[in-house]
């Protein structure tokens, strides 16, 4: 059985150029790409100032375009999963008139980055967006689009900010224009991904360190449950609030500062549900540090065990899994050659990530598909590079 073979960046670039020529009657002058990501471990820890261990994917968003002199932004997406309309036009923001989120929802990510972009003067532009990152699959199609937009704007009007500052602009765009109070992980990995490496991110200090992930005998399998979720209207903001409430009750700025022993000692100060939410986060931060160390020393069995512990904690304490994700994880763990498997992303649908011996890949996919009550889509990805300017 074969994994889905999404188009490579070169094919997406050709599609984007073709669509741009059809829409705007000229060849685009600029092209950029930014990847999706899979988080290997460290779930729902980023907005708690914890540790995360994502890798950038070969699934990317490509944005091509050209500046224009009339102060307008004209956008087109070729994504069939994006909400209508697929094309729209709006004026650049001014001191008197800010951009506002609206419909289509996909364009809000672009608008948000434009609104918060720190350099000036920004010209109007025409652009086409093409992406192989599945929408709502927990692989961060949103940050991929935000970072692609930011990288494109840099070509039109260079900025002088740090990588962390760029990530924060994209994060702010998601907060204010998509209504999702996300952490900074997705934007940082989309900017800083490096081929053959995962990236350990400290979401408190924003320090990053590369963790080797290029062992040829190893495979990272992403399984999409094809259950769609929309985080903005779901339980995500509630989980964030619960974590903040527990930290406050314990007199801490964030759950990053809380040890498991302190949480146990302060159990009476928080609700039962709040305790479970915090127990997940505090344990997950510890697991992520242990997992990065295991990967560095090539101990894939230890890494796999930590992945499974993470899934159980997300299912039982954080309660963001769902029957489909649990089914996919159980199926993977009952297949040969699998080190570990867990849900990844915000939850309530989306994807699982499985670490396995590469030689068992076809067998494992076949087994999962047979065991799963829905229809799964598989992606095999190497750890890839972050955002880049494309040339042809």
Curated annotation (Swiss-Prot):
The modification Phosphoserine is found at residue 230. The keyword Manganese does not apply. The active site is at 186 (proton acceptor). Disulfide bonds: none annotated. The keyword Phosphoprotein applies. GO terms for cellular component: cytoplasm; cytosol. Pathway: Carbohydrate metabolism; galactose metabolism. Its EC number is 2.7.1.6. It catalyses: alpha-D-galactose + ATP = alpha-D-galactose 1-phosphate + ADP + H(+). Transmembrane segments: none annotated. Alpha-D-galactose binds at residues 37, 43-44, 46, 186, 236. GO terms for molecular function: ATP binding; galactokinase activity; galactose binding. It is an enzyme of class 2 (transferase). The record marks 37 as: Transition state stabilizer. SUPFAM superfamilies: GHMP Kinase, C-terminal domain (SSF55060), Ribosomal protein S5 domain 2-like (SSF54211). Keywords: ATP-binding, Carbohydrate metabolism, Galactose metabolism, Kinase, Nucleotide-binding, Phosphoprotein, Transferase. ATP binds at residues 136, 138, 140-141. GO terms for biological process: galactose metabolic process. Belongs to the GHMP kinase family. GalK subfamily. Catalyzes the transfer of a phosphate from ATP to alpha-D-galactose and participates in the first committed step in the catabolism of galactose. Homodimer. This is Galactokinase. It comes from Canis lupus familiaris.
């Amino acid at each position: 059985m074969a994994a889905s073979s999404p188009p490579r960046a070169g094919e997406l670039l050709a599609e984007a150029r073709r669509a741009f020529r059809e829409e705007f009657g000229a060849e685009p002058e600029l092209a950029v790409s930014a990847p999706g990501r899979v988080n290997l471990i460290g779930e729902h820890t980023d907005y708690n100032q914890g540790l995360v261990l994502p890798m950038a994917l070969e699934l990317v968003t490509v944005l091509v375009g050209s500046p224009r002199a009339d102060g307008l932004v004209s956008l087109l997406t070729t994504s069939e999963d994006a909400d209508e309309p697929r094309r729209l036009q709006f004026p650049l923001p001014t001191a008197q008139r800010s951009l506002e989120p609206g419909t289509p929802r996909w364009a809000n990510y672009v608008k948000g980055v434009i609104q918060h972009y720190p350099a000036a003067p920004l010209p109007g532009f025409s652009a086409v967006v093409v992406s192989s990152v599945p929408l709502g699959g927990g692989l961060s199609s949103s940050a991929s689009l935000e970072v692609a937009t930011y990288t494109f704007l840099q070509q039109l009007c260079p900025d002088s900010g740090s990588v962390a500052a760029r990530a924060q602009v994209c994060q702010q765009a998601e907060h204010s224009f998509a209504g999702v109070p996300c952490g900074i992980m997705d934007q940082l990995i989309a900017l800083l991904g490096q081929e053959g490496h995962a990236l350990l991110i400290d979401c408190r200090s924003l320090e990053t360190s590369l963790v080797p992930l290029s062992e040829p005998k190893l495979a990272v399998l992403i399984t999409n449950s094809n259950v769609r979720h929309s985080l903005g209207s779901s339980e995500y903001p509630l989980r964030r609030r619960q974590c903040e409430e527990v930290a406050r009750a314990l007199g801490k700025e964030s759950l990053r500062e809380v040890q498991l022993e302190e949480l146990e000692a302060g159990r009476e100060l928080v609700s039962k549900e709040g305790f479970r939410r915090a127990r997940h986060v505090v344990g997950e931060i510890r697991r992520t540090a242990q997992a990065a160390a295991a990967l560095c020393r090539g101990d894939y069995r230890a890494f796999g065990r930590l992945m499974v512990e993470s899934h159980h904690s997300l299912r039982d304490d954080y309660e963001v899994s769902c029957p489909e994700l649990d089914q996919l994880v159980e199926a993977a763990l009952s297949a040969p050659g699998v080190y570990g498997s867990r849900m990844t992303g915000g939850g309530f649908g989306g994807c699982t990530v499985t670490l396995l011996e590469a030689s068992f890949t076809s067998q494992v996919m076949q087994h999962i598909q047979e065991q799963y009550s829905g229809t799964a889509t598989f992606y095999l990805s190497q750890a890839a590079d972050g955002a880049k300017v494309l040339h042809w």
